[in-house]
Amino acid sequence: MSVNPRKRKVVTRPAPEPSDSEGELGDGLLEGILSHSEDDSDNSREEEVDTDASSVIEGLSDEDEEEDEDSDSEQIRTEMRNLNTSDGPLRKKKGVPTHDMDLDTAVTEELEDDEDLKPNYTVTTDAHGNTRYIYKEIDPVYESDDSDVEATNTIGNIDLKYYDEYPHIGYDINGKKIMRPAKGEALDALLDSIDIPKGWTGLTDPQTGKPLNLSEEELDVLKRLTRNEVVEDGYDPYPEMVAYFSGKQEIMPLSAAPEPKRRFIPSKHEAKRVMKLVKAIREGRIQPYRAPEEQEEEQDAFNFDVWADEKPRPDNSMHIPAPKLPPPGYEASYHPPPEYLPDKAEEQAWLEADEEDREREFLPKNYDALRKVPGYETFVKERFERSLDLYLAPRIRRNRLNIDPESLLPKLPNPEDLKPFPTTCAAIFRGQEGRVRCVSIDPNGIFVASGGDDGYVRIWELLTGRQVWNAKLSDEEAVDAVQWRPKKDASVVAAACGENVFLIVPFTLLSPDVEQASREVLDAGWGYATSKPSTSSNGEAPKQAPGKWSRPGARLENKGVLVQVEVRSAVKIVNWHRRGDYFATVSPRGQSTAVAIHTVSKHLTQLPFRRLKGIAQTAQFHPSKAIFFVATRNTIRSYDLAKQELVKILQPGAKWISSIDVHPGGDNLIVGTYDKRLLWHDLDLSNKPYKTLRFHKEAIRAVRFHQGGLPLFADTSDDGTIQIFHGKVVGDLMENATIVPLKVLKGHKVRSRLGVMGLDWHPKEPWCVSAGADGTLRLWS
């Protein structure tokens, strides 16, 4: 539509005469109703002459040669549009805005009478002199929601055809009649179709009877719908999908329980059902749908060979083959050996026995030839019972685990990387008569002391294996224990023989300074014993001392045996304290006197326990603390000698403990048992064993840690072998000890089911000396 810069001519027309319909309706009834009709808007629009809108004419051309023709057609069109279809002139309503009136003034005059219809804004001027509209705040209770907007026509959902006979079409909220709006003629409809106003639909509002026009927002919605666009701004048609989200956002969860795992993993039951369907489809048991005509055509062709298209069908996945019958034995032969044929007594017993109690279902019989064998009487019965067993007895498939046993073992370091440790026999010490029961290496690593069944204590050179000293302590008793004093300032050997403990200084092997220091250590107690006051009072006999300290006699003193300690029962174990002033003895046959602690500097014997639970087997001092370990047959108790209280009870779970030894660090302990087990205890971890090692076939006699700083320990057994282990202990409490088997040393012979009786480590080198029941000592390096 083009705009003509020239103004069109003003066309005047006579006012129409009043009609009967106008007089019938009345001006008062049309007050506020016809003011918004199309006719009024057209009249008010055409009355304005000197505005720019009057120059806008649809279809007007700008060509000069067609100016006259266009002006005539425009004049005719304007006259047709300005025709009033009503019978009488409509006067200008009060407050109706026209182009001659200011818009704000008209609205104010229209809404003066009703406060509810007043505008919700105030007209002011901004800083630039422009008009500014200031709107009131919206009441969020009513004004923000149009769900309760009052309807203009309150007749409800009633068709307007029932009001065709009446001049009104309904009632407003105040009960006043809403008069029917004036209807234009066909010419008005034609003109309206030519000049279509904005928002025109050509429809009539069923409630008001007025033309139905659309607003800008509604037009925008229709445009978006026709373009397949989202109607509402900010609406996301494809929100992020959450599998467990219902679609409605809640402030609080309906259920805070976590989703089960079955929601996120495939269903096994559905997979089984699907696999059944897949298998049925592959086998042809499930066919796709076909029309009935095709099926009838296929039925016409007959296949007489039933198995022509037969294909081998694989067994079901749950199929388990029937177990095979055992093959027949010699007794089932028609010509069995004579030893399988029953005699008359056995045959009679078989016939008299009940069928369920018979060992066989038949009696063996002998036939000369196969043609003489008759039919088997119970053949059908056996086949029937076999069928019943296959039908009724459940079957099970037992899967064999093909697992390499080596893969189950822990990964241990290579023993070659853990050297040095003893591997071969370097020397053999011969000369002992009978079994060698005990062995000990001196703190300097030069001499080896041993004791055996012959009652001799012998001292050998470690490197050469030559015997350099010996002394016979008893003709009847065996030497059960030998132990060097751990201090290097003096050289003293403690040997247990029967009920006596002898303290020996082999002065022929010592230098004068060491000999003098050793004699002073042993002689210091004699003066203390002499000056000690008597414990008897009121004429009562003194109590018997637990140990009697005396000199052994001239014969033994000349040999270097200087002190003899006599206790109440036979001593089997002797262990020194780290300071060298105390040593403990264990007499398993004694009860309250089984464990005794002896003080060398005072020649004093003490019994630390009034009564002991169980039979004592061995005892050991802690290497750095005032803790004393006592092992009975089944338990190991640790006592604090300073506080005189029980610290801990270890439970190895063994039937009979043979020996124990404490790690130089003091936090670990190994236990040897007569039931062939070697146990490692971590004192900081638990009272139960940390590791249990079963490598021996016979009882374990002795266990020993290396005291020179090497991570080695060993045990001896009656099977004639010595097991060497790597035992690494670190200071980090979060890391456990590392135990690795290194070497099995074999060389001792077993005599009377006794093998290796004792063991001791070199104080510095990775060497060890073992004592065997075969009467020899062996140095392993």
Curated annotation (Swiss-Prot):
Region called Disordered, residue ranges: 1-103, 529-553
InterPro entries: BOP1/Erb1, BOP1_N_dom, WD40/YVTN_repeat-like_dom_sf, WD40_repeat_CS, WD40_repeat_dom_sf, WD40_rpt
Gene3D superfamilies named among the record's database cross-references: YVTN repeat-like/Quinoprotein amine dehydrogenase (2.130.10.10)
Keywords: Nucleus, Repeat, Ribosome biogenesis, rRNA processing, WD repeat
GO cellular component terms attached to this protein's record: nucleoplasm; PeBoW complex; preribosome, large subunit precursor
Biased composition (Basic and acidic residues): 36-46
Any one biological process term the GO annotation gives: maturation of 5.8S rRNA from tricistronic rRNA transcript (SSU-rRNA, 5.8S rRNA, LSU-rRNA)
Single annotated GO MF: large ribosomal subunit rRNA binding
WD repeat segments: 431-470, 474-515, 611-651, 652-691, 695-735, 751-781
One Pfam family here: WD40
Biased composition (Acidic residues): 60-73
Transmembrane segments annotated in the record for this chain: none
Biased composition (Basic residues): 1-11
Family under the similarity heading: Belongs to the WD repeat BOP1/ERB1 family.
Protein's name according to its UniProt entry: Ribosome biogenesis protein erb1
The organism's taxonomic lineage, starting at the top: Eukaryota, Fungi, Dikarya, Ascomycota, Pezizomycotina
